[in-house]
């Protein structure tokens, strides 16, 4: 090489070497030197676009790639990179177009199938995502990333066994893929396998010690198993690696209230004013600021911060949440009213004895479940399994009908689903709890499938529940981030349960939370009698259990003895909520 007068090819080699070393500035300078001599040097434009992408200047990267594709319209590498750049700019439909064009030119292009599958996953086009990712794996079975995203897709499809299998395959191919360990932990946690969940998070952290997400998830797992000191340490590690992520402070503040000092308040206000702060961060900043107002009993300001926080949180997941709101207020009502089963010649004999606990969030259902599960029999507690909802919605999609089929076949399928959750055991006479609160939508279905099932409707003062829902970040409940939707959801719940009870009197046990906490022994005895279970003092000593697990917003309170709740505690909020509740007789 002539160092005084290198060729363009030699200069490009030098630019690539500097790019690989991370010296982006020198690489960029060399690229522009080449383009000053030959403005249409294709490889240089591609490299310069990669440099811009590394610097997160995706607009510039897209411009350079468009210039490159004009030079060579059928270049699959450029099309792939254009798709990825559009994806970073949030132009997901354009990204899909580029990936599909790349596949049209090269039907065996693994990267294009992987990128297309990953983009469809981001758009929650799950069936399409699954198909494209499986094609990428077929073309290149030793490529770990498609297995990782396919695992994520299976989680969203509630195919937990397939998700576990795909994450494990990703790990087998590339053990150092920290995201696969972390996401595998999330599945184990969803299945209440906390031992394996915690192990997975720790492996992710060992591979990548600054994996803030894994530290956060480890903290939640510790919190849900009652290991609060370990949870605090893990939240603090998440903060160490993401000091401006306000979600970490929000979750830590539940366990360590003294962090809510003036210094943190100033930091929160500074962060949420930044132009590049994410909607999720602004949401958690407002949630935190509401806690300061709650401490000083400035109820109107507290609610205003909560309203703002929930708006930002909803908008950070707008596409997904708008779909879920429609599902909760339109689809679920149609399903509740329309699902049918075939009972011809069916016998009412079945092996399992489920105890369903229904209601709205923050109604005392966690307390009720722990009382039932802590008696002499120590029956398995399912918490919020979502088994019925997932089963019903999947069946409707498969059959394209509200007729779900024969009762006997449905019972067999549900038996297997509950068994996979570890809830069915001869040791406990196949008795277990399912505390999926929105099972009130499936009351008619439950009665037809399990005519001898026990159903407990947990009722609490509406104002208390509504304020508690709005104060707590119930992350995945799309309707819980808007007061109008909360009131509407309550009204649907009250109408559905009232209508069912009129047709089926005494089938559902109506439990009043306030009565339970004011007279726990008397009310818990009545409850256990209804369930057909023996009562003992252990029922009220649930908080002493070493194996107590709770993933609900009550997981801190549930580790203490029952205490009385004053209705007056929430009265100051009523005047601010009247504008939402005035059209509902049950609120006035």
Question: Positions of the model-derived regions?
Answer:
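Phosphate-binding active sites in nucleotide-utilizing proteins
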Residues: 348-448
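PAPS-dependent sulfotransferases, especially Golgi type II membrane carbohydrate sulfotransferases
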Residues: 252-253, 265-276, 286-354, 405-423, ...
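Conserved alpha-helical positions within TPR/SEL1-like repeat arrays
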Residues: 16, 43-54, 77-88, 111-122, ...
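Conserved phosphate-donor/acceptor-positioning beta-strand/loop module used by diverse small-molecule
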Residues: 446-469
């Amino acid at each position: 090489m002539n160092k005084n007068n290198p060729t363009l090819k030699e200069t490009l080699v030098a630019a690539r070497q500097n790019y690989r070393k991370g010296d982006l500035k020198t690489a960029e300078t060399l690229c522009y030197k080449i383009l000053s001599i030959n403005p249409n040097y294709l490889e240089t434009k591609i490299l310069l676009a990669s440099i811009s992408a590394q610097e997160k200047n995706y607009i510039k990267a897209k411009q350079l790639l468009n210039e490159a594709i004009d030079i060579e319209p059928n270049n699959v590498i450029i099309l792939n990179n254009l798709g990825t750049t559009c994806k970073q700019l949030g132009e997901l439909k354009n990204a899909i177009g580029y990936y599909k064009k790349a596949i049209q030119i090269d039907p065996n292009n693994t990267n294009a199938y992987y990128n297309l599958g990953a983009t469809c996953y981001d758009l929650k086009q799950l069936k399409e995502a699954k198909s494209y990712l499986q094609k990428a794996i077929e073309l290149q079975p030793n490529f770990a990333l498609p297995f990782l995203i396919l695992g994520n897709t299976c989680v969203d499809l509630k195919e937990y066994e397939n998700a576990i299998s795909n994450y494990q395959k990703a790990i087998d191919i590339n053990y150092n893929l920290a995201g696969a360990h972390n996401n595998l932990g999330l599945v184990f946690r969803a299945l209440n396998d906390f031992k394996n969940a915690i192990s997975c998070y720790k492996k992710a952290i060992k591979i990548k010690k600054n994996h803030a997400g894994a530290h956060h998830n480890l903290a939640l797992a510790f919190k849900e198993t009652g290991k609060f000191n370990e949870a605090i340490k893990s939240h603090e590690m998440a903060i160490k690696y993401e000091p401006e992520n306000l979600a970490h402070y929000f979750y830590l503040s539940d366990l360590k209230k003294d962090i809510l000092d003036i210094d943190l308040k100033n930091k929160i206000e500074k962060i949420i004013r930044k132009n590049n702060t994410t909607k999720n961060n602004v949401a958690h900043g407002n949630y935190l600021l509401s806690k300061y107002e709650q401490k000083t009993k400035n109820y109107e300001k507290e609610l205003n911060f909560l309203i703002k926080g929930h708006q930002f949180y909803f908008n950070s997941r707008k596409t997904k949440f708008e779909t879920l709101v429609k599902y909760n207020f339109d689809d679920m009502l149609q399903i509740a009213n329309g699902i049918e089963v075939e009972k011809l010649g069916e016998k009412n004999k079945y092996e399992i004895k489920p105890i369903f606990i229904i209601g709205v969030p923050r109604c005392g259902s966690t307390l009720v479940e722990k009382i039932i599960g802590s008696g002499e029999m120590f029956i398995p507690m399912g918490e919020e399994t979502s088994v019925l909802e997932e089963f019903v919605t999947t069946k409707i999609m498969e059959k394209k009908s509200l007729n779900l089929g024969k009762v006997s076949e449905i019972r067999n399928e549900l038996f297997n689903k509950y068994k996979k959750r570890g809830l069915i055991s001869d040791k406990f006479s196949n008795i277990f709890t399912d505390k999926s609160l929105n099972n009130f939508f499936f009351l008619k279905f439950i009665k037809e499938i399990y005519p001898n099932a026990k159903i407990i409707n947990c009722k609490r003062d509406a104002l208390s529940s509504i304020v508690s829902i709005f104060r707590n970040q119930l992350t995945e409940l799309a309707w819980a981030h808007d007061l109008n939707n909360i009131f509407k959801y309550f009204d649907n719940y009250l109408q559905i349960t009232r209508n069912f009870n009129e047709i089926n009197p005494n089938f559902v046990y109506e439990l009043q939370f306030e009565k339970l906490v004011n007279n726990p022994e008397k009310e818990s005895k009545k409850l256990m009698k209804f369930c057909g279970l023996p009562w003992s003092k252990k029922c009220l000593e649930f908080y002493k259990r070493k194996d107590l697990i709770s993933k609900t917003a009550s997981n801190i309170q549930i580790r203490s003895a029952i205490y009385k709740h004053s209705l007056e505690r929430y009265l100051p909020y009523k005047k601010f909520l009247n504008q939402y509740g005035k059209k509902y007789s049950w609120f006035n």
